[in-house]
Amino acid sequence: LENLERVVREVCTADVEPDGMVFDPTTVKTERIKEDADYEGVRVRFVGLLGKARVAMQIDVGFGDVVTPGAVDITYPALLDFPAPSLSGYPRETVVAEKFQAMVYLRTLNSRMKDFYDVWLLARQFAFDGSMLAKAIAATFANRETAIDVAPIAFTPDFTEQRSTLAQWAAFRNKLPNAEAC
């Protein structure tokens, strides 16, 4: 944890072209992600300042995941007239595979409504190569030692019509600016 904290503090103080955003290295804190004890991860939180506005920042770092078909360069859109940042990250197939694995693994205990929304949104915004997506799902399930269920409970009325699921979905939707779309 201390090493990752040190690295993020260094990044916060990196000399970059001024864009109005300043990261406060004294606010960097790390904690182990405990959502699922089977997987190792660290959450890093810190504060960014945009003028007088405080912006809560969070980075989740996972370890030991398989990335299929491999890391990709992702160019993020810039809000201001600055060069768009480019980072290496998970391909969409791996993102979907990990979220789908969590849906299957957690069964009726799943409270991660954002995963369902993310998969829905990705499916609407991007075309997927079915065979590559299948490879990513197979690799993720194998790495996480999860059996592929042909009829995941997360897609049945036993889950979707549970009072707790409906309440969690309604609460999640209320946080979205475009809640009526889903």
How should these model regions be labeled?
Residues 2-182:
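Structured mid-to-C-terminal alpha-helical surface segments
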